[in-house]
């Protein structure tokens, strides 16, 4: 059956404790120490991400019926979808969108693996949509680009300027200053120990503007 959203994220970095403290400082996560030197970040009763030691990068866990590995640093995890178009609206600090960045699109793979439909977006961008619970709703995006590869993670914030100021206070970097794109008003940031991601201001739902387009 079609995957209708995320179970969770996972961030691999060289310094998990320092990295999760950074994101907690910017996004207000509640941090729980897990076994093996890993950590988890929560907003209320919803898990946002695990932070573990390893080669730097984000891993995306989609909800589904059969746990399995997928390509491009992603997996299917059995259980209730916590973040997606049919889940509760994203709160500050929570995932609110994901985009696959790739120079070699393979939309047929994701359609076959996750039961998605491909819908046109803009230029080199398409939407992957799920009809699992009714009319199709966007679950993820795909951007054709040779500038980056892998899953780009979006996290919700209430005040983009304040969040960027906090990034700088905590020795992170603002890679892209606040600007408006089709998804909404965003900034790109990176912590002092890695974990580049996008902040999206006050998304109206999963996918920001895509949720209401």
Residue ranges and their predicted role:
Residues 1-3, 7-48, 100-135, 162:
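Core segments of cupin and vicinal oxygen chelate
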Residues 5-15, 38-47, 52-103, 119-135, 141-144, 170-213, ...:
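Vicinal oxygen chelate
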Residues 37, 53-54, 180, 202:
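Residue-level structural signal for beta-strand termini and adjacent loop
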